[in-house]
Amino acid sequence: GFFSIILSELGHTVMGIDITPNMIEESKLLAQSVGSTAQFAVMDAENLDFDDNTFDIIVARNVTWNLPHPDMAYKEWLRVLKSGGMILNYDAEYAKNHHHLPQSVHNAHEHIKPELLEKCHTIYHMLFISGTNRPEWDKQLLESYEATVTIDSTVGPRIYAEEDEFYIPVPMFLVKAIK
C-alpha cells in the first residue's frame, strides 16, 4: 500500500490490489492508521475485475518480476486504462539476478534459512521473466500492444536512500507506458 497511501494523500482516488489477502489487510490497517482514503482489494494483476477504460494511471512496484504471465498483466493493465492513460511500473530483474547476489548480513534475506532460499531460487528460475532482458522485454511487449514506452534505468537512486540500497541491491528501473 506504499504508493496507494502516498497517492491518496495527494488527493487522488486510489484502488490498491494484491493477490495476497494478508498484504491487503496490512495495507488497510496502515491506510487507516494514517487516515488515508485509499481502497484495497484482493485481486490478480493478470485478471483484473475492473471494466475497460476505468483508470487514468496504474502504478506498480516490484510486481512484474514475480508474475507467472507478465505479458497478461500488461495486457490487462492497458485494458483498464483510459485512452491517454499511463502505466508507471517500478521493477528490477530480481528473478534473474537474485541468485547471484552475495548473501551478506546486509541483504534483504539475511534471516531466511539457506534451504528456503534454495527453494526460492528454483522458483525464480521457473519464472518466464527470469529468462528475459529487462526492461527491454517490457518495452518491446508494450510497444507490440501499441503503447508509447519510455524506460528510465536511473530511477533507483532517486527512490532508495543510500542506507537502503543494501536491502535491494539489484538496480531498479521504471517502465512508463502511455495507452
Model-predicted regions and their roles:
Residues 161-167:
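Short proline/glycine-enriched turn/loop segments at secondary-structure junctions
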Residues 71-86:
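A short glycine-rich, Lys/Arg-flanked "PGG" loop and its adjoining helix->strand segment in the class I
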Residues 14, 87-88:
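A short hydrophobic/small-residue beta-strand
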Residues 56-70:
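A short SAM/SAH-binding and catalytic strip from SAM-dependent methyltransferases
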Residues 43-58:
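A short acidic, Gly/Pro-enriched loop at the edge of an enzyme's catalytic core
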Residues 1-47:
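Class I SAM-dependent methyltransferase SAM/SAH-binding core
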Residues 90-161:
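C-terminal alpha-helical "lid/dimerization" subdomain adjacent to the S-adenosyl-L-methionine
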Residues 145, 171-179:
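C-terminal lobe and adjacent flexible extensions of AdoMet/dcAdoMet transferase-like proteins
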